[in-house]
């Protein structure tokens, strides 16, 4: 690892902390971004399994260090690949009161996207739903009860880990109170 990092330029080391959002980019554009900026992570748009497999293969072949390739595996493999299995939103899984369902969501959803080269999930959603009008988490979080969110999230995380994916819990720093979308405006949470 020391040798690998030692052989990177300062710009390439800086590039490792960035995650690039891919949106219908050509393979040549992806290669150019990696070669020019040394980007270490990618978040991609939902495409067919064949397209994603090829895209992710090119990312890894072009990168000097194995890249992180992320998707939103919140409700199943359909969050990462067209035609992937939709298991259910977090609120549906939470309503079952069965932690095994949260594990299965993490495991099987992540297993599907791992098959096409994804290795990082932007899930679980660990927000606590305190306002049913919240447009971001009202149907995307496990519960309005902190204990349920905690237990379901732990199970999801274990499932994702067992499927071979790294997980990034969200949101930032938390959502669920305000009615505004913190992806677009500053909210009061």
Positions of predicted regions on the chain:
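A general, composition-driven signal for non-globular sequence regions
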Residues: 6-10, 138, 164
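Enzymes and membrane/adaptor proteins characterized by extended Gly/Ser/Thr/Asp/Glu-rich
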Residues: 23-26, 30-151, 171-189
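Boundary/entry segment of secreted carbohydrate-active catalytic domains
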Residues: 1-26, 156
